[in-house]
Amino acid sequence: MAMLDPETLRTFVSVAETGSFSRAAEKLYKTTATISYRIKLLEDNTGVALFSRTTRSVLLTPAGMHLLAQAREWLGWIDSMPGELQQINDGVERQVNIVVNNLMYDPQAIARLLAWLTQRYPFTQFHFSRQIYMGVWDTLLHDDFSLAIGVTGTEPLAENMAVYPLGEVTWLFVMSPHHPLSQQTDPLSEAQLRRYPAVNIEDSARRLTKRVAWRLPGQKEIVVPDIETKVAAHLAGVGIGFLPEPLCLPLIAQGKLIADTFRPCVPLRH
């Protein structure tokens, strides 16, 4: 409709934001008479008063406040549309969903990645999900995600996907220096280990077979939801188990954890 053309809406928003016809005129490089005429025409066409005028100020009416919110949204959409259309023409997706392995999820790293992505692709919406073990594959295969960081294994689980190596995770068997096993002489036997619970993270897969974490036959297991809780449980001495080397080396250096030479029969890989 002509009464809601972009030029009229920008005039209305300027008057609302400055609270003055004359200041809006200066901002838009128009005469005060032009601004006043546009607002009067807009009010006549809508059939409602958008401003309450006094000798000192111009205030929005309830209808004016509603139009202001809508006008800002419309103008934002109009201003961004050329860039959005160009991005679509270049083959850039409007929505990109990325799933990240719990072991590799770092809030600061994700924030830096988002800063780069949003600058490079300003009109794309990004959705990040944090999953555990086979939950990464599960999300990638079944939940409309197009990229995964840190999938398990070296082969894709679908023909239309490609896997690129990031490296292997080295695991260390650790415990609190206050844990009873810390006083035992290396190497620890399975019989000694079985007396204390293993702390493991629950696999978040819902449709794929869950990964079996390290636990000896007959050993009690404590299951936690994420790597942060697993680390905290080790620090508190409530259980034993494996942690990624880069994560636990600083804690070992600080004397908060100790590493044992125990190695499982089947090497841990991730």
From Swiss-Prot:
InterPro entries the UniProt entry points to: LTTR, LysR_subst-bd, Tscrpt_reg_HTH_LysR, WH-like_DNA-bd_sf, WH_DNA-bd_sf
UniProt keyword terms in alphabetical order: Activator, DNA-binding, Transcription, Transcription regulation
Annotated DNA-binding residue span(s): 21-40
Function: Positive regulator essential for the expression of allD operon. Binds to the allD promoter.
Gene3D superfamilies registered for this protein in UniProt: 3.40.190.290, Winged helix-like DNA-binding domain superfamily/Winged helix DNA-binding domain
Protein name, as recorded: HTH-type transcriptional activator AllS
GO molecular function ontology, one term from the record: DNA-binding transcription factor activity
Domain spans labelled HTH lysR-type: 4-61
Family the entry assigns: Belongs to the LysR transcriptional regulatory family.
